[in-house]
């Protein structure tokens, strides 16, 4: 294919056929388990407050709205799906487009396909088992292994992430030849994320998927804090062959605590010179009305297909990447 023929798809037709078969297999997986497929909006008047996520923004100027309404493309269907859960829909899954105004590369595209599902009355470990079942079915891989966040850091970096201070974290980063970044970084969680990305991820999930669970409580996001150890959150991620595939939570159901976390995110955004984001009041109202105890997970479908096909990059499994869109 000529590099100038940008009308052509980035992925080959045989790969797109295989992708379609995997999408059908995912739907069968959930149909066999009685999980309802749902569709939720791609746009919302509120968005995520996470300091590491950057949403696309647009403006609706249709009849009756001459002043316009700010809308955000969804970085994940999470908030709308939780509103469905609070309304009593039971276990749900969704295959949808998500959007993040961030990088483009081998493992990233600003528009991507997300698989997200929620299981009422599942704890984190039971959902991890279901994720493992799906990966074995789609990837024909070995059963996954699991490490706590603390075990992963102690094993690969010889540091305890739950007790180390910022000086110790900077010293650990310096051993990875990244002191030029760490020397000016004041946020503890950013240092931990740097260590996870550069010092842990390259060493895990090589032969089989690896779950990392019990992230620090400061990185809980929308997850519950563990009742057994208040230093950690009921949150997990799964990695395979150098790729982060999924991020899951035992979901927070306390509306007041969730609002406090959103507000704290916005304070962090302001301190970094980032725009503060509108908080999703509809989500908070749904939590207040009663979100059932549940666990949920978001999985990158394009990355899953890439692994299933042994492809080198997302461009090999997406019909049109952003540079050809």
UniProtKB/Swiss-Prot annotation:
- Extract the Pfam families matched here: tRNA-synt_2
| CC terms in the record's Gene Ontology section | cytosol
Give a yes or no for keyword Aminoacyl-tRNA synthetase in this entry: no
A GO MF label:
lysine-tRNA ligase activity
Alphabetic keyword roster: ATP-binding, Ligase, Nucleotide-binding
> Which of this chain's residues are annotated to bind substrate?
76-78, 118, 251
Q: Which NCBIfam families match?
A: genX, PRK09350.1
Q: Describe its function.
A: With EpmB is involved in the beta-lysylation step of the post-translational modification of translation elongation factor P (EF-P) on 'Lys-34'. Catalyzes the ATP-dependent activation of (R)-beta-lysine produced by EpmB, forming a lysyl-adenylate, from which the beta-lysyl moiety is then transferred to the epsilon-amino group of EF-P 'Lys-34'.
Family per record: Belongs to the class-II aminoacyl-tRNA synthetase family. EpmA subfamily.
Full protein name: Elongation factor P--(R)-beta-lysine ligase
Q: Which organism is it from?
A: Salmonella gallinarum (strain 287/91 / NCTC 13346)
